Amino acid sequence: MSLSPHVENASIPKGSTPIPKNRNVSSIGKGEFLGSSSSNNSSFRMNHYSNSGQPSVLDSIRRPNLTPTFSYSNGVYMPESHRTSSFNDSYLPYDKNPYAKTTGSMSNKSNMKIKTKKNAINTNTRKSSGLIYTTKVDKELSSIDKVNDPNINGLVCAGKTHLGLYKFSPSDRSIKCVHDFITPNSNTSTRGTTSLLPKLSKRTRQNKFSTIADVKTGFNNYKNCIAVCNNSTAISIYDLNKSSSIDNPLITSLCEHTRSINSFDFNMVESNLIISGGQDSCVKIWDLRSNKSKSSNRSDISINTASDSIRDVKWMPGYNFASKNDQGSSTYGNLKSGYKFASIHDSGYLLKFDLRQPAQYEKKLNAHTGPGLCLNWHPNQEYIATGGRDGKCCLWFVGDNANAAENTVLNYGNSPSLHAPNTSLNNSGSLAFPKLTINTGYPVTKLKFKPAYSSNIYNSLLGISSMGDEAEVRIYSLARKYIPKHVLLSETPSLGLVWWDENLIFNIDKGTRINGWDINKEPTVLENLSKNTTTWRDLDGNGLLSVDQEIGSYEVVEPELQPTSSTTCKKHPGTIKNPKNGNPENQGIIGGIKKGFSHTGLTSFTPERPPTLKAGPTFSTKSLTLASGASSFNSSSASLTSLTPQTENREEIAIEPPCIITLDIPQIFNNIRLTKIAHSRKKNVISESSSMKNSPVEKFKYLARQLKFSYIREHNVSDSADTAYKNDIENIDVVKNATETHGDNTTTTNNNDDDDDDDKIIESHLLKKYNFPENNTWATLMNEKVNNKKSKRNSSSSREFDEKDVRSSISSISASRQSHDRSRKIDKNVEAELQEKIQTLVDLISIATHNASVYLSIDDLTNFKIWILIRDSLLWDLKWMTSSQISSDNASNMDANESSDFEAGENLKTGKEFPEEDGAGTSGAESLVEERPQAFRANSDEPSDAEKKPVSKLKEQLKNTEIIPYAQPNEDSDEVLTKLKELQNQRLESRTKMGETVSDDVIIEEDEHEHQEEEQPHDSPTKSAQFHASPIAKSIPILQKREHRKSFIDTFMLHSPNGYNGDTDIGNEDDNISPRFTYNSVSPRSKVSSLQSYATTTSQLETFKKLSSHTAPIIGSPRHAPSRPDSIGREQLSSSLTKKLAKCKKIIADPPWDTKKLIKQLYNQATETGNVVLTVNILFLFQTIYQITEIDIAKDAIAHFLLLLHRYELFGIAADVLKYCPFEDIMGSEGDQSSIRLFCERCGELITNESSKEKLRAEAQQTGNKKIMDKFGYWYCDSCKKKNTSCVLCERPLKKLTMVILPCGHEGHFQCIQEWFLDENEQECPGGCPGVAFI
């Protein structure tokens, strides 16, 4: 194959020269081996095979494993088998290593052991066999480049103290150092072996290069030139042909940079030009023809890029690629390659220049977010690949063709480096988008395109080397940016790379090795990766993630097209000749530029690109500087149409990524299982419950996730506060209006008294609404109401009311007939409060039902029954509230304890009209005969319509009885007594027939009834005297034994937890008749038994007096008639009354116990048994309603519950608990402070003082004095019963802030120490310790 003089990428011949069999060859020469400075176990050893002509593997030891077992850089998974080093024995197995022979025996024993490593991932994994060149030198290496002479297989490597010419032999696969230009006295020989250790005389001074050493070789006529940084600011040019010790290889030195040089490059077309860039932000172009002296301090062109340090600068390459077509062979080249160059800067900007107009950059791209480190041009297209410290490799289009306007990218943002021309460009909308971005994950320091022609940019290969710890060179195909095509592993991190041709690539590493690979023999990453994978989508296993993709390739198949941006020619144009001047200095690019400078401007060139906006250069002779304030040339042609940012600047994708399919497999399976196999779910629940029983932690986590802890909804606090304030104002106005109206009809008082009454109304309303502790309490309000009711009953005969008493009670005002119309306004507010209470009850009932079902799912029947008990008790309260109707007469006539139970939760006793004495035998029945013990009660004491009907008829029938004088009986009373006597005789006869005996187990004394009569405020002294005059009944016969009845718990435990049918359960007379309505039930407080005893007395008149005294007020009170058992005993006046009152038993049914008392008992049981979840749940739901315990204890319990949630990583539930918690500052001091453990100074035990804390807390609860808790502290120890160290000055316990004197260690109060040292100006310790303690 004939090669063009400009062709750089010479191909390796298909057939290689065979190696002689009877010849022992090593990749390191014999002389080189003998001249090594060290010959220990880590040095190289020669392995001779008896019948082998092939070289052995290089190292006798395995290289250290610098990379992890699995690498995830760039998102590519590579098993260890694929990442095995090319230098490992297992990496070159005998069956695939062309350099090791499988037959024969070793003639000399050595330490080398060849091991084959089995691939556990894939049995078809290809091993690497592409490493064909490798050698190790004893000099530090930092840069490598190829010799652009097709007749010499040469490489140039440079380091801090080394500049060597190396030649590699494809025949014997060896690399040899031919000449070292830094050590001319070294005994180097091109015939045989080479020595890397220079034999210097003692007086010879060794030259050193710059620490940032870059090496480049020339092209064409300057192919024998080597450029290297001799020092930080100079470029030295050496001649490869002067390799003898007599000749001086140094041609010239170029030194005009004021700071360190980072990069330089030879022009492939105009080979006499060299460009350089450095830290001084200047680009300098040198013409080697004009710099023939040994040292040159002036460059031909100098471009100042303002403030950005230049990291890399490159000419556009000028490759000539030969191809065949219908007309024969032709050569493709780029006419612009001799003029264009690009630079990348510390700021991340990429600048493209045209040498014909150097005063203005053509393109400015913000390529990287951090410093840009390197760049490289595509061999035949106008693309530039850049690498930066941000770990990205970006591909940018920098062409000028009009059809690629969408690829034109402007400078955007604030540019601190270059001064852009004065134009009206709107940079805010201009954006820079690369055509392709490869995320490497490490800073990219070196990158090189494969020197091969490609019509499609995505079929190009790009070699990348990093500055990190990755001991590899990655070769990417732009068609696959996520998976590299080849990964070339080395012993140590790579420092540089160079392509010799399309197939051969060399690199150097930190281990001073030079390695060469044939990429055609290297396996691709896709060949060693699995073709599909399936994994769980998340940690909990909720779904599968499956990726399936064909193996594909690294190329994009497209029809072959002729390049549009290149011009077909037989020979690439060399230099630009000036026909008017034959001087070589005035020929070519530099000559044209100089001629242009001699005229008015830079427009003397014939432009080969669209006109761009140019700024006027400010230069002296040959120096150019980009000026920001200069006017532009050809302003008329400064068209900005091509600079308009496009909207679709998106990164192109050559190969579509694989399709990712996600399936919620567990959810699908659960749906199938629930629909077709329902019984399997029950088995799973049983297994889960059994596992939870064995693991308390899992049970706690499950309950914390499933239970409901709060019924509070999110709301706007400010809005609710405003609404409440408006309602309060309206309520106060209504009360004042009602009071004023009533005052007009009664006796008028002074204005001062009216103002005081208004203040009392406002105070009482605010206290009731917001629970203010000042000036009044709920008990005071209740007492005022009770006193008003009593005064009303006492003065019922006179009908005279005191105005202050009426105005102090809203209920008495609304009950008066004179304010009947105005009290309706208050009813609306009462109804709103009632609806709020009902809604709260409904929420609590739903939460209780849910919690019961949660406990039932894990077979925790104890807690299940507890929540069912709470739910049913709340259902009783809800039934009473919904069944009670708000009457216009007594809508606001509520007990104070009813509202307080709901709003403040005070433990108040319910006011009773007929108090009873405490008996010793009332333990069982006392909790069942309390009247309406629920906390949430209706806002009216008036019974429902169904209850009013029988009561009202009863009042009409007994109206005459109510007004009978108690002194003399009349005929009606005799008739009633006669009927009562006949009824009693009939029952006695029936009992006698049954053979039952009369028992006298129950005895009620007469003074019991006298005590009841004295407590009735409406009875007159005359009635009381007549009542005391009645004889004492000695015994009461029991007519019928008490029948067996079901308890409340037995009744409701048999119900289903899914619902509650209140009407059905209450309406069942056989099962759910309350004992207070049982006609013949016996209890210590039974009034039926007392009535039966009255019938047996001889004095019927006195018996009737007592009967009438009890019956009249009971029947006259519509509130207590249907609900008190006392009224039932007095209904035996006639059979008709008995029948009517029997209907009330079916309607009226009080709850068996008080809800507040029940929940308190459950809370105490939960705390005693250590049921944390139930305790916290009760506090969350009922603390603000019933005041289960003290607020501090509730907050402390919730805070500890939060710590438990954090301990078991239930952070979401803990956040919800804090969000919906009814209390503030739950965490208290633990939220922002750390706990400190204190140990006793005497006994050494941890000071907790829990026993004294409980004792003081109990004392504070009993006495109600919270100051008792101030005695508690950690200044004493419960274990040894002694105080800790006292103050050194006052000898009192140290309870608060403590100061310590450092020299002696004495402690004292802050105030005491302050007074001693600061106020009294003392310098010694108060304890008399020697030395100065404070200065």
UniProtKB/Swiss-Prot annotation:
Which residues are modified to Phosphoserine? S1030, S1074, S1081, S1083, S1117, S1127
Instruction: Tell me a Gene Ontology molecular-function term this record carries.
Output: zinc ion binding
**Which CDD domains does this one have?**
mRING-H2-C3H3C2_Mio-like (cd16488)
What species is this protein from?
Saccharomyces cerevisiae (strain YJM789)
> Pfam families from the entry?
WD40, zf-RING_16
What is the recorded name of this protein? Restriction of telomere capping protein 1
Protein function? May be involved in a process influencing telomere capping.
Per the record, the zinc finger regions (RING-type) lie at 1294-1335
Gene that produces this protein: RTC1
> Mind listing the UniProt keywords for this protein, alphabetically?
Metal-binding, Phosphoprotein, Repeat, Vacuole, WD repeat, Zinc, Zinc-finger
Q: Which family does it belong to?
A: Belongs to the WD repeat RTC1 family.
One GO CC annotation, please? Answer: cytosol
Outline the WD repeats, range by range: 207-248, 256-296, 305-342, 367-406, 439-486, 489-527, 844-884, 1130-1170, 1217-1256
Q: Which GO terms describe its biological process?
A: positive regulation of macroautophagy; positive regulation of TORC1 signaling
In this chain, the stretch annotated as Disordered covers: 1-39, 559-593, 600-619, 630-651, 736-758, 783-824, 935-956, 1007-1037
- Give compartment(s): Vacuole
Q: Which PANTHER family match?
A: GATOR COMPLEX PROTEIN WDR24
Sequence ranges of Basic and acidic residues compositional bias? 945-956, 1009-1021
- Compositionally biased residues, Low complexity: 630-644, 808-817
